[in-house]
C-alpha cells in the first residue's frame, strides 16, 4: 500500500485545521502545508486585541493554549506535518497532480505531487475605489504583517 500524499495550500486557520484532521484520519499520509507568508495557524480574531494593546506578545496569536508557537517545527514534531512557510503555490497541474511552488525569499522552486489537494487560501480584501484609498495609513487588517504595521503606527502616534 502506497503512502497517500496530501497537499494543503493555505496556512492561516483552515489549512492547518484541515491538515490536522487529515492526519487524524490517516496516520501514514505524507501531509504538506504550503503557506505564502511566514506565520502559520494565526488566530486572526485576536488581531484587533494585539493592535489595541490588550497584549503585547504577537506570538500569542500563533500559540497553542499551552504557549507553544505553531511554527513548522511544531507541525512536524507534534503532528508529523511538513509546513513550508514563505512559499507560494504558483501553479496547479491537475492532470499530473502536482503543485508548483516558489520560496518567496530565495526564489527556489519545487514541485509537490499529491493524491489529495486541499485549497484553504482564505480571502483577499477588496479595497474599494474611493478617493483617498491610497493615502498613507489606509490599510486592511488581514494578516500578521498588517497587525504589526498597525501596531507600529499606533505606537508612533503616542
Task: Outline where the language-model segments fall.
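Beta1-alpha1 glycine-rich phosphate/pyrophosphate-binding loop at the start
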Residues: 2-84
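FAD-binding core/adjacent interface of flavoenzyme oxidoreductases
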Residues: 2-7, 69-158
